[in-house]
């Protein structure tokens, strides 16, 4: 068994310093990861003559992209905390079995999803609202991206196991390397080689492939604390079952983004037309600047909470949670204020169309009005995961999007003359309600969860 050189740090190190060491690289990685899609959209939106239609087409692929991410995190977000808890209990053998089983699951999922989505994507794109013009661009992008699904799942699903060991910088470099390659290749493939939308997809797949190689080399190398071994890749239900049970809440959160995207697009298309749908495409990208860094903060806090929970150190678990909690709230509150004051600056990144910039700026102020409360909800819900509370985490994951937001998108327009305003208003209403319920639930159960572990 390898010596856990990071154990003393997790058990005795300064909590704020640990969170900074683990969260900052994770946040940077999440922001850079966001560039994969944002850079594609910015470049595609500026393709001469076809930019608007091409951007719309690529946007229609978003629900499928979200589902691929959801399946990757089903394994990664559930397996990594389980591995961290095992490490906290000094059971590295179990932690390595979890790593091996999760890798096998990701490979299997990649094969199945590639086949299913490659065959069904044209039909799905039509259901999402693709026209004869936009379907061409959507299909061109989708087919190439889907063929690279294996690399996407490996990068998203296995990188969490690097972070959970305390190697946050290595984890960050996975994303940095891929994003830099993508940013360099995008203009070459799109403009220089004249590949257009196909070039954007190919650049993304190649950059993800390099990231996957980086991860696998590290996890099979000498520096890792948990090594990926063939002997641990044989699936055992008792090993991967608890991982999937824990990861299901993240899967639900991410997969419902797909349904949410379809709900917003269909309603806005009905009440506001193309300009409203275009504004939503911009808003979706900007909103990820809130949610992805939050995930990074919680990814940094998760190993600290999980490890000390497994090591039966409740005081350090509490301190880690409250440090993470306050950080999330400060970030979302600050972002909310910036968007309220400078919405046009954000909208103008994605388009030079004055009408769309004005419309998107108006919509942003409505949509983001409750974004400050997301810090409460995400921090508490993710902390339930870090503590191994899969059922509660799943319920709270369902609350905001499935129980509240999606129904409100269709209900609120019945009570307002401005139907588009009502559709956008559904977001802050659901944000605030979900955050209130989640925060109360967490603080009600937190102490009892810690006592049960004694």
State where each predicted segment sits.
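Short alpha-helical transmembrane segments in multi-pass integral membrane proteins
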Residues: 1-25, 83-150, 192-247, 305-370, ...
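Small-residue hotspots at the loop-to-helix junctions and early N-terminal turns
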Residues: 52-63, 138-142, 201, 272-289, ...
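Helix-terminus/linker motif at the lipid-water interface of multi-pass membrane proteins
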Residues: 31, 35-56, 125-132, 188-195, ...
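Short runs within selected transmembrane alpha-helices of multi-pass transporters and secretion channels
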Residues: 145-163, 171-179, 200-213, 295-299, ...
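Residue-level signal for transmembrane alpha-helical positions in Major Facilitator Superfamily
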Residues: 20, 35-36, 75, 116-120, ...
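N-terminal transmembrane alpha-helices
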Residues: 10-50, 63-78, 82, 107-114, ...
């Amino acid at each position: 068994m390898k010596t856990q050189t990071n154990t003393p740090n997790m058990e005795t190190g300064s909590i704020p310093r640990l969170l900074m060491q683990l969260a900052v690289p994770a946040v940077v990685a999440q922001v850079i990861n966001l560039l994969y899609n944002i850079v594609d959209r910015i470049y595609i939106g500026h393709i001469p003559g076809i930019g608007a239609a091409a951007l719309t087409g690529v946007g229609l692929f978003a629900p499928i992209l979200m589902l691929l991410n959801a399946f990757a995190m089903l394994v990664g977000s559930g397996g990594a905390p389980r591995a961290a808890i095992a490490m906290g209990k000094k059971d590295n053998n179990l932690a390595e079995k979890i790593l091996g089983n999760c890798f096998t699951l990701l490979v299997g999922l990649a094969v199945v999803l590639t086949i299913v989505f490659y065959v069904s994507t044209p039909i799905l794109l039509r259901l999402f609202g693709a026209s004869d013009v936009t379907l061409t661009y959507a299909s061109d992008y989708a087919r190439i991206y889907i063929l690279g699904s294996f690399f996407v799942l490996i990068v998203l699903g296995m990188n969490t196991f690097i972070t959970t060991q305390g190697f946050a910088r290595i984890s960050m470099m996975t994303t940095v390397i891929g994003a830099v390659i993508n940013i360099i290749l995008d203009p070459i493939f799109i403009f220089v080689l004249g590949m257009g939308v196909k070039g954007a997809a190919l650049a993304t797949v190649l950059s993800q492939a390099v990231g996957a190689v980086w991860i696998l080399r590290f996890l099979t190398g000498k520096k890792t604390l948990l090594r990926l071994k063939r002997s641990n890749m044989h699936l055992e239900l008792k090993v991967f079952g608890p991982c999937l049970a824990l990861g299901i809440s993240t899967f639900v959160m991410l997969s419902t983004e797909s349904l949410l995207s379809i709900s917003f697009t269909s309603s806005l298309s009905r009440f506001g037309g193309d300009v409203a749908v275009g504004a939503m495409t911009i808003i979706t990208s900007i909103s990820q600047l809130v949610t992805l860094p939050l995930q990074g903060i919680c990814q940094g806090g998760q190993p600290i909470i999980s490890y000390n929970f497994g090591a039966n150190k409740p005081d350090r678990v509490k301190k880690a949670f409250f440090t993470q909690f306050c950080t999330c709230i400060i970030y979302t509150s600050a972002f909310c204020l910036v968007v309220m004051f400078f919405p046009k600056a954000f909208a103008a990144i994605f388009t030079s169309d004055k009408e769309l910039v004005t419309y998107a700026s108006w919509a942003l102020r409505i949509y983001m009005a409750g974004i400050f409360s997301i810090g409460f909800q995400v921090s508490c819900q993710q902390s339930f995961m870090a503590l191994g509370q899969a059922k509660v985490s799943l319920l709270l994951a369902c609350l905001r999007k499935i129980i509240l937001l999606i129904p409100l998108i269709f209900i609120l327009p019945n009570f307002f003359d401005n139907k588009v305003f009502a559709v956008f208003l559904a977001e802050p209403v659901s944000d605030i309600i979900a955050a209130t319920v989640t925060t109360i639930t967490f603080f009600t159960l937190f102490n009892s969860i810690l006592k049960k572990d004694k």
